[in-house]
Amino acid sequence: MSVADTKKSAEQKMQKSIEAFKADLAKIRTGRAHTGLLDHVQVDYYGSMVPISQVAAIGLADARTITVQPWEKKMVSAVEKAIRDCDLGLNPATMGEVIRVPMPALTEERRKELTKVVKGEAEGAKVAVRNLRRDANEQFKKLVKDKTISEDEERRGQDEVQKLTDKYVAEIDRMVAEKEKEIMTV
């Protein structure tokens, strides 16, 4: 394994950490409706639990309302129950075959709690990125010990991985600022 391989591997893993963080942020509810909010909701479909997206079409009626239209009429009540029970504080209302899910307004206290959650998630993502940097640096040391690369190449590789780390930590900070702004917007 060379310096370039180690750097490329570290960058790919850091990118995956960012994508996982982005997915975690999407699950945090703001006052605005988005279809990804219901992604983790599981519905009892003839005895087995399946994601809501497999039994219903999910869309947006407006900025504060999600619409859920089950593909089978008899699934309406099961889907509504699953949404109500999914610890997001949502209160769905059925209108015929369509379930409307209005987004309740967030209280100031809840907004502050959510910002703390976002910061905690961000810290976890930063730690993951830094651990990947450490792993890459250990790989460089191993390559020097095996006399595969020189100490100068090790230093260059460490500097490049540090630049990657700084880039991804800055990206996490940017995403946090964006999410906090979204949460605090009334």
Curated annotation (Swiss-Prot):
GO terms for biological process: cytoplasmic translational termination. It holds the Pfam family RRF. It comes from Cupriavidus taiwanensis (strain DSM 17343 / BCRC 17206 / CCUG 44338 / CIP 107171 / LMG 19424 / R1) (Ralstonia taiwanensis (strain LMG 19424)). Its main location: cytoplasm. One of its GO terms (molecular function) is ribosomal large subunit binding. The keyword Chloroplast does not apply. Keywords: Cytoplasm, Protein biosynthesis. Belongs to the RRF family. HAMAP family: RRF. It is found in: Cytoplasm. Gene3D superfamilies: 3.30.1360.40, Ribosome-recycling factor. Responsible for the release of ribosomes from messenger RNA at the termination of protein biosynthesis. May increase the efficiency of translation by recycling ribosomes from one round of translation to another. Signal peptide: none annotated. This is Ribosome-recycling factor. GO terms for cellular component: cytosol. The keyword Protein biosynthesis applies.
